[in-house]
Amino acid sequence: MNSRIMILMLTGLLCVPAGAVEIEGVKLADTATVAGRDLVLNGAGLRKRLLFDVYVASLYLPAKISAAAAVLAAEPRRVEIHMLRKVGADDFLEALKNGIEANASQTERDAIQPQMSELAKVITAIGKTKEGDTITVDFVGGSTLVTFNGLEKTRIAGEQFNRALLNAWLGDHPVQSDLKKAMLGG
């Protein structure tokens, strides 16, 4: 093989972004733009339930952060969920509720009940997700923007709701410990 061609091929291989991440066939972008600000991929991991791979979750922040408490102070922030299988709306909502309940007091849960009702309506309207669907949750200016496959579904006001939802993944009792660690870059 011609040495010039070999050099060009090797150079091309070296130009692949070092931060490019692929999990279970899902290629994650190194950056995302939320509210006009560039965010970096902080970390990503695989959500499992029993023996099944359910989704890939990724966290985007203004800068890399490894402490959950510091993530809650960062703004804007994004959680992106790439579905790997069919999941019913009730099952998805139940998992989120369990994550929130495990990390919030009864008083905190009571305070965000109207926002939880709004989220439940949206998830119910989305219905059963399938492999390849993407749910994006942006946290901006005290509100939570939920999109499904690129289409805005709702904007839910309230910083307390915003934090409670993020804590389902990153709180002291996350839905899955190794997913939390992965989203925090570990």
Predicted features by range, described:
Residues 1-7:
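Bacterial N-terminal signal peptides that target proteins for export
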Residues 16-20:
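Sec/Tat signal peptide C-region and signal peptidase I cleavage site
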